[in-house]
Design a protein with these regions (language model features):
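Conserved non-catalytic scaffold segment of RNase H-like nuclease domains
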Residues: 2-91
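Amphipathic alpha-helical interface surfaces
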Residues: 67, 71-75, 88, 99, ...
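Substrate-recognition/cap helix-loop segment adjacent to the acidic, metal-dependent catalytic center
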Residues: 82-83, 98-117
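Short, well-ordered beta-to-alpha junction loops that form the rim of enzyme active sites
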Residues: 92-97
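Short, flexible loop segments at boundaries between secondary-structure elements
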Residues: 115-132
């Protein structure tokens, strides 16, 4: 993402992994870098610009020819290939509240395909910090 505010910032990469209940990898989906124009990239603050420059993502964004729509369609096809029942699988990851907001804003078909529940590992990290 180019920042943390849906509506102002945009998605620049989407990657998907499918795991079983024991978090064993079942399938690795496409890792897609989404082209964004100069107007969208101008919304990045210095921290995000520096991070995306250091890790090479900014260069990949410029070089990409993948649209958000194409990335969403490829991701949705991957999910449907591996998940037979709509809304049966939660979104899992780190600090995914932000991811959910961006999915709802830009890729609602993916947001609606996933279960409303989430597994956010940042919650586990915060609990471990407080309980230890």
């Amino acid at each position: 993402m180019t920042g943390l505010e849906p509506g102002r910032h945009v998605i620049v990469e989407i990657a998907t992994l499918i795991t079983d209940d024991n978090l064993e990898l079942i399938a690795e989906g496409p890792d897609l870098v989404i082209h964004q124009g100069p107007e969208a990239l101008a919304e990045m603050d210095d921290f995000v610009t520096s991070m995306h420059t250091r890790n090479g993502l900014l260069e990949q964004i410029h070089a990409s020819t993948i649209t958000l729509e194409a990335a969403g369609a490829a991701t949705m096809a991957f999910l449907q290939e591996h998940i037979s029942e709509v809304r049966s699988v939660p979104l899992c990851g780190n600090s995914i509240g932000t991811d959910r907001r961006f999915l709802a804003q830009y890729l609602p078909e993916i947001e609606n395909f996933l279960h409303y529940r989430s597994v956010d590992v940042s919650t586990i990290k915060e609990l471990m910090k407080r309980w230890n």
